[in-house]
């Protein structure tokens, strides 16, 4: 049969199978793409330290693996307008700061003969979102503990200073709802700045961001059609995971009609030089937002397949949790094979860091592995390393003179064993004590919660009681007793109304 007759017939059937309008691309643009494979490697770009947060091992999430098998599909060049991502994405993060309210406390306990015990503590001071912008703030470098204020034969004499200070923190912004997304927020997202975090004394404040209605852009891509069922399957463009169209529907947003894809992205698809627009039935609900970004298992369909690489990642996750340690090789299992906005991870000095950043496809790695060439780039670039040194990068990449890439190393006969060296994972510290890490006397300092009682109630003294009970003779008698019984006493414990320790590791 003449192909000039069969092709229009096949494309007309697409409308019936996918409940969309008639699709009639130019037959001259048809191209069969049987093997559109994943790139060998992906790597973050522009993922600086202020976009990362320390996380517990339980918060690691394996990447989605999208089915990029295109056998049996026909690809048609098309124009795609997306509200979320494109080839020239720009800044996907919103700049901001964590605002901390912390009481710096110095505690002095003095014995009868003048011996002193000095303690230092940080105390959470509850900070509301309304209060966050009401006071002038300083920087972490300007913080200090007050000088001790000691009294003879008195325990737990406190000298307090309250500071409001900021630390830089950028977060991802939902391009549709303009919600702020970050693991530091309660529930993983915040609707309006200032935003409350998991810590009662820390609030995030940032810019409003760019309205979604003004951020759409047109990119080039392909529309894939199943040869047998004649259904529209997906749309693709470099720099994004495939847009699944199995359960696509039409929804109104910003005064325009958009295709809501299987994972919630909003796109529009034009073909035949913009003469035709792809459409679907109306959505039954009006939900708009980046579905699935906060929970890896929030939305699963047949675009996400149970693949070998995903199983390897789940096994790596189980090993990390059971041993409370991580190696560069295990961390490499959490790298997404798809370019675009992805969860990224790094390991550094006992901590695992997480962020959501743009990743690019790597087409070529230099022979010494110190640089790479991104897809469509003409020059080589050094690997980004967020911690300011030349050792640790993202997803297990490490090394000084020779860069070790676990994804490549596992294929060679003489692999570098450094990718198997474990790092014990520390509990995630409270963010308000990070400023103290450069001090030398901070081993006993930790963050504490503030109880409801008056801070001054911890001040107590024997001296008024001594004076009232008989003056000098009683004082001498008390001195003899102190010599006999108290000279070798251990360090004075905290008062009975002690402030409970704050353990961030309990956070899920």
From Swiss-Prot:
Signal sequence annotation: 1-20
The keyword Transmembrane is annotated on this UniProt entry: yes
Entry keywords, A to Z: Glycoprotein, Host-virus interaction, Membrane, Signal, Transmembrane, Transmembrane helix, Viral attachment to host cell, Viral envelope protein, Virion, Virus entry into host cell
Positions of glycan attachment: 56, 400-401, 438
Location relative to the cell: Virion membrane
Pfam families registered for this protein in UniProt: Rhabdo_glycop_CD, Rhabdo_glycop_FD
Record has 4Fe-4S as a keyword: no
Cellular component aspect of the GO annotation: membrane; viral envelope; virion membrane
Side of membrane Virion surface, spans: 21-461
Gene Ontology biological-process annotations: symbiont entry into host cell; virion attachment to host cell
Membrane-spanning parts: 462-482
Domain of life: Viruses
InterPro entries named among the record's database cross-references: Rhabdo_glycop_CD, Rhabdo_glycop_FD, Spike_prot
Subunit description: Homotrimer.
Biological function: Binds to specific receptor at cellular surface, bringing about the attachment of the virus particle to the cell. Plays a major role in the determination of host range restriction and virulence. Class I viral fusion protein. Responsible for penetration of the viral nucleocapsid into the cell cytoplasm by mediating the fusion of the membrane of the endocytosed virus particle with the endosomal membrane. Low pH in endosomes induce an irreversible conformational change in G, releasing a fusion hydrophobic peptide.
Similarity comment: Belongs to the novirhabdovirus glycoprotein family.
Protein name: Glycoprotein
Biological source species: Infectious hematopoietic necrosis virus (strain Oregon69) (IHNV)
Gene transcribed to yield this protein: G
